[in-house]
């Protein structure tokens, strides 16, 4: 990996700040400064040097709840979302250790004063680490946000959430709207720091993600600094456009060591006017595991903004700056989307470049010109819609991860999402399941209860269940037990 001189990095303190000039700054310098700023923030926060954040500040009333796991803050209205955003940005409340749960879909149509939850909009040249991260758990409860629109060309590092640190964002869909900014822009999260988890989150086809410079992702713009993050059971259907390089269908860039992306898919067009574009992730700088993922969206690297060579890949876009010793693993993945690029871009349907990458049981749709590649196995596109291909993807798994769902992903295989984490159907020791009056009833002590449909959709607790088969997951006395229940 090439390193910029430390003196040069420190001299760029004003870069990427609202109102600063970036005319003479190269993309590499900008990337380096963003990473330096966030690393400085992490180090300062860990050392207790940052005093302008409060983990237990007085919280707004919201629509109920106490912010505990058992009794989370309830989010029902636009005002609840605005109150959360304001509490993080203006009241400096990180909500570390606090829990939120949406109770219904929320429409932001016509709402102009909602700002991304957790952001760095008030950073200054004197204090570039002055950012407001969200550090709690936000459960969308399988509800959707509609018509979320936020456009600011001078701001960076945002999506619906801006900057999150050690947070969990789960069970949330951003169905429609448009998010657009300068750099590090994501459909769900702008920047994920220090062990962030994004689980079962989705973007809709009526949602757009636009990034004027680098680090654009359908789910998260950049995973930067601190402990490894996890992106699990997420899909992107939102068209994504960037102009300066490093763009991925799910994630723009990863600089964390040990990040995992599992059971995720990109189905949207990913258009990069420069280079370094990937169907799943744009750029890798440290160790990462990508497992049971797919790209079926059109991925393009037009190389209009760069005179140097670039790269494009159906799974990973670029590994050229990966730190020596990084372990990059791709397992049970496939690429079936069109790859569009212009010379001198280096293309590979799985991952381009010479950095050592472990690729197991992964596939790509054969090229029309008959070109073959050493990374992955080529298969005819039409054969990817057959059960034989599903069986190939499931080789080496304890249970069937991949299935074909009618009307989903143009007939190509998809993971079973949440239920893929369920390996065994067994009986718990501290709690048991019964069917009473046609409804599922749990007897005994348990810590966590989750009910899923067989296609992996998590249902809100208390929902009226129709006749059919359900997966019930309990965590009791530290043991996870899973039941298949038929009503």
Report each predicted region and the residues it spans.
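Bacterial N-terminal signal peptides that target proteins for export
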Residues: 1-9
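Residues that act as N-cap/strand-start positions at coil-to-secondary-structure junctions
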Residues: 2, 111, 130-132, 155, ...
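Bacterial N-terminal signal peptides
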Residues: 9-18
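Serine-esterase "nucleophile elbow" of acetyl-processing enzymes
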Residues: 11, 23-24
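Surface-exposed repetitive/solenoidal architectures
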Residues: 24-422
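C-terminal outer-membrane/trafficking sorting elements
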Residues: 423-487
